[in-house]
């Protein structure tokens, strides 16, 4: 179905996997279907997902951490060009201040509440 290294639009990702078109952790039937990550907000993608303070975003990240299994991960390479980089699973989720501080410095963001560490499966 998905081909590693191939580019997809968000509409194509939505049609294939379901979930919302604009969030970076789309969900369908209560499960996160994939991750769509930008390097601007997630400079270590696809190995980490940096989670901000929005309650909706935090809830979705917690769902990903709890659901188990693997998800397809896409990294944005250009306008509406999302590269499929493979299937990943959650290695660990951290709200530890040491991890938060490290990734806030790396990303330049100041609103992080959680870091989700992924590993390729």
Q: Which residues does each predicted region cover?
A:
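Aromatic- and Lys/Arg-enriched surface recognition patch
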Residues: 58-61, 75-121
